[in-house]
């Protein structure tokens, strides 16, 4: 019989693969930016938000905050590198006004993280308290990002078209939420359960909408639309799961 820890590790590994795939989902968008040497109408906000979430979860997973959570650090460490690369490309091809705004937001995020780190390490002296404080922050920011698909879902209902909501991406986001919710329930972790259960619910709603409206979607044409599909990314840990948010940009042919 498989032990709970072994089952959780298996689910966590599967979740790692899905999460890593979601981190890489915006690659086509940034390939386009590099080819055109212009960010066009794309915004850096989703990637800045994801960067903050990854920083919070990396801090959550280090031994002095939450022991035995190396996988939390690794998946979100990868997320930091990936999001940092996206932001570097975005900065490289942005006009000065957007660059200054990016630097300002990054500065605020770094100051916020420094305040969190100092406050937690100096003000909380047990792993339980430190995990609780950082975990609550991660749940708060992660849950906010889970509500971002509401805009896309509203557009689907209004237009009776799923052209702005790719099926595969909706499915992967749903599986990601289900996987990490299952991971959290094997050995109950409230900090993981809340945001990932929201992700599973919103992913399920997207799939239901797709089933309802895909027949009424206009046939594809040669024009291309750039779509930003919000999703929240999670990574595993020995005793907890890390979550970060990312808005996945894809190109849908109409």
Curated annotation (Swiss-Prot):
Annotated InterPro entries: SWEET, SWEET_rpt
- Please state the protein's primary subcellular location: membrane
MF (Gene Ontology): sugar transmembrane transporter activity
Which membrane topology term applies here?
Answer: Multi-pass membrane protein
User: Please, which domain of life does this record's source organism belong to?
Assistant: Eukaryota
Q: Where are the transmembrane segments?
A: 10-30, 46-66, 70-90, 102-122, 132-152, 166-186, 190-210
Q: Name one Pfam family in it.
A: MtN3_slv
All disulfide bonds of the chain are: none
Task: Please give the GO cellular component terms listed in this UniProt entry.
Answer: plasma membrane
Question: Which N-terminal residues, if any, form the signal peptide?
Answer: none
Residues in MtN3/slv domain copies: 10-98, 133-216
Keyword terms, alphabetized: Cell membrane, Membrane, Repeat, Sugar transport, Transmembrane, Transmembrane helix, Transport
Residues in compartment: Extracellular: 1-9, 67-69, 123-131, 187-189
* Compartment(s) where it occurs, according to its Swiss-Prot or TrEMBL record: Cell membrane
Please give the residue ranges for the topological domain Cytoplasmic: 31-45, 91-101, 153-165, 211-254
Describe the task this protein carries out.
Mediates both low-affinity uptake and efflux of sugar across the plasma membrane.
How does this protein assemble? Forms homooligomers and/or heterooligomers.
Q: Which family does it belong to?
A: Belongs to the SWEET sugar transporter family.
Name of the protein: Bidirectional sugar transporter SWEET6b
Organism of origin is Oryza sativa subsp. indica
């Amino acid at each position: 019989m498989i032990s709970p820890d072994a089952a959780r590790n298996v689910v966590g590994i599967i979740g790692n693969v899905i999460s890593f795939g979601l981190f890489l989902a915006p690659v086509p968008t940034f390939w386009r930016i590099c080819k055109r040497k212009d960010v066009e109408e794309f915004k850096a906000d989703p990637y800045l938000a994801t960067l903050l979430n990854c920083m919070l979860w990396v801090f959550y997973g280090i031994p002095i905050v939450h022991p035995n959570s190396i996988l939390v650090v690794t998946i979100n460490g990868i997320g930091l590198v990936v999001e940092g690369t996206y932001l570097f490309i975005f900065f490289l091809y942005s006009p000065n006004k957007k660059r200054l705004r990016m630097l300002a937001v990054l500065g605020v995020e770094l100051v916020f993280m420094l305040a969190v780190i100092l406050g937690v390490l100096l003000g909380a002296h047990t792993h339980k308290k430190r995990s609780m404080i950082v975990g609550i922050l991660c749940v708060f920011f992660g849950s906010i990002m889970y509500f971002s698909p509401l805009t896309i879902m509203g557009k689907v209902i209004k237009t009776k078209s799923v052209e702005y909501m790719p099926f595969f991406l909706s499915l992967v986001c749903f599986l990601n939420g289900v996987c990490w919710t299952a991971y959290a329930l094997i050995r109950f972790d409230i900090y993981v359960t809340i945001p990932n259960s929201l992700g599973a619910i919103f992913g399920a709603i997207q799939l239901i909408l797709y089933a309802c409206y895909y027949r009424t979607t206009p046939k594809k044409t040669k024009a291309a639309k750039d779509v930003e599909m919000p999703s929240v990314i999670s990574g595993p840990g020995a005793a907890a799961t890390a979550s970060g948010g990312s808005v996945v940009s894809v190109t849908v042919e109409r």
